[in-house]
């Protein structure tokens, strides 16, 4: 983060100059659409579905990036400052968002959509790897992947709906209607997950990175993660225990995520004759994803993958 902090001073100067050159009109006055930036993809998807034609939503993350190591450029920071709204999960879950807010705060509105979630609804980090030094953004002791739980995702979608109504009350009825359609889809996904996990051949899912804790908790299966929340690698003792467990249970699949690489997982997979299955953590899209992908479409693909891992 040192390089990121060093660039804040010139960024703030550029933002101030851009503000001075603005002839007194806001972006919203020049363009009726609400300009939105988000961190993880689900927030962008929800903003687009609720806001419809009245919003232009973008995610800050390039396709396929590992969000643990992403840092915005100076140009990115200026774009964020010119937006009407910046949506992120929370200061704890999105450390990069906190840095962006410190740099451009006062130029854009910021919505921490996951702040509505009660503390007792959050998952503590329970991975028992030895401590390792690693670069990037440390998510601390709480699992940030709240969006993978469709019930918690609905709470965040409602926060986005309320903020859009605040910014553009003339479209309130449209936002309410669009939110209700989205909420109905999220209820359906919750029910599909409940049904899929009601009676399974296995009770554990092996995955390359600790990211499905909320799904495991709500739908009553065990997550066995090879790398921790911040991609910290397992100790030799943990590694041996994981390999032994895979062989004892005759596990057939290890889930890989679309934007996270793990050489340790590759080694385990090849040494245990398990097959890789791609699980989409939804944090970012990749070049392989359809341009019209939504939270719902990706989660339904995940339901199929989880069903395969829990039943084959």
Residue spans for each PLM region:
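Sec-dependent bacterial lipoprotein signal peptides
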Residues: 1-18
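Extracytoplasmic metal-acquisition and chelation regions
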Residues: 4-6, 20-312
């Amino acid at each position: 983060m040192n390089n990121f902090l060093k660039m804040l001073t010139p960024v703030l100067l550029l933002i101030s100059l851009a503000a001075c050159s603005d002839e007194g009109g806001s972006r919203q006055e020049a363009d009726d659409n609400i300009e939105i930036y988000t961190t993880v993809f689900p927030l962008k998807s929800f903003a687009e579905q609720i806001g419809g034609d009245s919003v232009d939503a973008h995610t800050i993350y390039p396709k396929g990036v590992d969000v643990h190591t992403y840092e915005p450029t100076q140009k990115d920071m200026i774009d964020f400052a010119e937006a009407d709204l910046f949506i992120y999960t929370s200061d704890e879950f999105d450390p990069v968002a906190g840095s962006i807010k410190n740099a451009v705060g006062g130029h854009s509105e910021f919505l921490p959509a996951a702040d509505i979630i009660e503390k007792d609804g959050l998952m503590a980090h329970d991975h028992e790897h030895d401590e390792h030094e690693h670069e990037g953004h440390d998510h601390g002791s709480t699992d940030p992947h709240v969006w993978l739980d469709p019930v918690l995702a609905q709470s965040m979608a409602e926060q986005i709906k309320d903020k859009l109504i605040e910014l553009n009350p003339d479209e309130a009825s449209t936002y309410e209607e669009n939110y209700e359609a989205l909420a109905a889809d999220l209820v359906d996904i919750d029910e599909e997950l409940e049904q899929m996990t009601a009676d399974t051949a296995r009770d554990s899912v092996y995955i390359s990175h600790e990211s499905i804790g909320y799904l495991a908790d709500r739908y009553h299966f065990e997550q066995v993660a090879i790398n921790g929340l911040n991609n910290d690698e397992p100790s030799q003792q943990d590694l041996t225990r994981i390999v032994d467990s895979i062989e004892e249970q005759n596990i057939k699949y290890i889930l890989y995520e679309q934007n996270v690489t793990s050489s340790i997982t590759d080694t385990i997979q090849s040494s245990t004759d398990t097959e890789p299955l791609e699980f989409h953590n939804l944090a970012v899209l990749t070049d392989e994803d359809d341009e019209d992908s939504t939270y719902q479409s990706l989660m339904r693909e995940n339901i199929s993958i989880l069903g395969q891992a829990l039943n084959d």
